[in-house]
């Protein structure tokens, strides 16, 4: 039985999305990395994506934001997210890697080792084992799915609403010889095409924040999870220190939402309530950002070179410093001027920079967490 528990959602149109993907991205999904792919876009399609995405944000500052504007973004959550990743995926790969998430850091731990450990920790908390059938909700270009597949031996299905990311994920899985252990499916996670009780376990890493409501996405995950199965999530949430009457707090939240394709970010208390209201039994919940780690989770975005752990990390993090971003964004603007880069590249990069600044501010002031861990079980039948 396939019957989404949600109603009033955007209508899916896979042919439309496939046609747009071809027009904008062409064969760039086969490119070696983010920079190489960035310059192989269809200009008219990219401009359409820029216009469609930024219509929700341009000239709409936090002090004047209305409930109607937030509701409009929620109503178009799928289009908002799809076009965000049409614009941002190559920049993510260039600046961060193929696992689009934050992590905790130990002293002396290289950046990419810390990223992998964060993925392993979630798999361990859920209890993912060899031979399990597992769903990755909002899989990006498949970095976490590949790592968890290798770590556990499970078969992982990645679900994603962006054709380009699906193509990138499939390409990388083939290159690593993991095609038999991984598959990637195009679809809206609010209305999944999978039958009820399909998966032994489900996880989501910083992806369900794109849902219009957390109860809606968690209810859909509950539906496709087998009775007795476990769901684990690293959720993006405003902490309960967030005060919506405080303009600075609202500016931080809106900056994160705009720069990260989010229609409506909730507070921790709302996230916990959504798990319970969806029918799950909560096994564990904790803000991992509150752990007394030697290095803060946001240090790479802050561009604080004093935290660099290895020589290799220096070349990753230097791009995130203020002057590193200034040079990169200036170059993007120059390339646009000479029509060597598609229009909208610099505007997208500037929006990501706004998000980075607001993420750091939210982290430092304990207003935001990208790693609120919730592990919950669907009751056995």
UniProtKB/Swiss-Prot annotation:
It comes from the Eukaryota. Its EC number is 2.1.1.-. It holds the Pfam family Methyltransf_11. GO terms for cellular component: endoplasmic reticulum. GO terms for molecular function: sterol 24-C-methyltransferase activity. SUPFAM superfamilies: S-adenosyl-L-methionine-dependent methyltransferases. Coiled coil: none annotated. InterPro entries: Erg6_SMT_methyltransf, Methyltransf_11, MeTrfase_SMT, SAM-dependent_MTases_sf, Sterol_MeTrfase_C. It catalyses: lanosterol + S-adenosyl-L-methionine = eburicol + S-adenosyl-L-homocysteine + H(+). It is an enzyme of class 2 (transferase). CDD domains: AdoMet_MTases. Keywords: Lipid biosynthesis, Lipid metabolism, Methyltransferase, S-adenosyl-L-methionine, Steroid biosynthesis, Steroid metabolism, Sterol biosynthesis, Sterol metabolism, Transferase. GO terms for biological process: ergosterol biosynthetic process; methylation. Induction: Expression is positively regulated by the FgSR transcription factor that targets gene promoters containing 2 conserved CGAA repeat sequences. Pathway: Steroid metabolism; ergosterol biosynthesis. Signal peptide: none annotated. Belongs to the class I-like SAM-binding methyltransferase superfamily. Erg6/SMT family. Sterol 24-C-methyltransferase; part of the third module of ergosterol biosynthesis pathway that includes the late steps of the pathway. The third module or late pathway involves the ergosterol synthesis itself through consecutive reactions that mainly occur in the endoplasmic reticulum (ER) membrane. Firstly, the squalene synthase ERG9 catalyzes the condensation of 2 farnesyl pyrophosphate moieties to form squalene, which is the precursor of all steroids. In Fusarium, the biosynthesis pathway of the sterol precursors leading to the prevalent sterol ergosterol differs from yeast. The ringsystem of lanosterol in S.cerevisiae is firstly demethylised in three enzymatic steps leading to the intermediate zymosterol and secondly a methyl group is added to zymosterol by the sterol 24-C-methyltransferase to form fecosterol. In Fusarium, lanosterol is firstly transmethylated by the sterol 24-C-methyltransferase leading to the intermediate eburicol and secondly demethylated in three steps to form fecosterol. This is Sterol 24-C-methyltransferase ERG6A. The lineage of its organism: Eukaryota, Fungi, Dikarya, Ascomycota, Pezizomycotina.
């Amino acid at each position: 039985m396939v019957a989404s528990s949600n109603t009033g959602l955007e209508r899916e149109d896979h042919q439309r999305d496939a046609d747009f993907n071809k027009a904008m991205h062409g064969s760039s999904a086969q490119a070696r990395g983010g920079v190489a792919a960035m310059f192989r876009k269809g200009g008219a399609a990219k401009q359409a994506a820029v216009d469609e995405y930024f219509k929700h944000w341009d000239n709409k500052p936090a002090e004047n934001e209305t409930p109607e504007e937030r509701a409009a973004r929620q109503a178009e959550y799928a289009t908002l997210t799809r076009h965000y990743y049409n614009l941002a995926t190559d920049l993510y790969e260039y600046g961060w890697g193929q696992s689009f998430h934050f992590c905790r850091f130990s002293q002396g731990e290289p950046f990419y080792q810390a990223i992998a450990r964060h993925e392993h920790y979630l798999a361990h908390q859920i209890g993912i084992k060899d031979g399990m059938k597992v769903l990755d909700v909002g899989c990006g270009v498949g970095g976490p799915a590949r790592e968890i597949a290798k770590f556990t031996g499970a078969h992982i299905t990645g679900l994603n609403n962006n054709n380009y990311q699906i193509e990138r994920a499939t390409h990388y899985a083939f290159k690593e010889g993991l095609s038999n252990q991984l598959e990637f499916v195009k679809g809206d996670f609010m209305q999944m095409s999978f039958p009820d009780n399909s998966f032994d376990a489900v996880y989501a890493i910083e992806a369900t924040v794109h849902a219009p409501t957390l109860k809606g996405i968690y209810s859909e995950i509950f539906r496709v999870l087998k009775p007795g199965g476990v769901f684990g999530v690293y959720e993006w949430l405003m902490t309960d220190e967030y005060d919506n009457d405080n303009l600075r707090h609202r500016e931080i939240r809106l900056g994160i939402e705009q720069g990260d394709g989010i229609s409506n970010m909730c507070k921790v208390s709302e996230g916990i309530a959504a798990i319970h209201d969806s029918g799950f039994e909560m096994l564990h919940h904790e803000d991992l950002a509150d752990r007394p780690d030697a290095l803060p989770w946001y240090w790479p975005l802050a561009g604080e070179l004093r935290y660099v752990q290895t020589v290799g990390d220096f070349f990753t993090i230097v791009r995130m410093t203020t002057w590193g971003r200034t040079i990169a964004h200036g170059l993007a603007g120059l390339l646009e001027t000479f029509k060597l880069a598609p229009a909208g590249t610099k505007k997208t990069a500037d929006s990501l920079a706004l998000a980075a600044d607001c993420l750091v501010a939210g982290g430092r002031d304990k207003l935001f967490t990208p790693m609120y861990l919730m592990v919950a079980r669907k009751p056995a039948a």
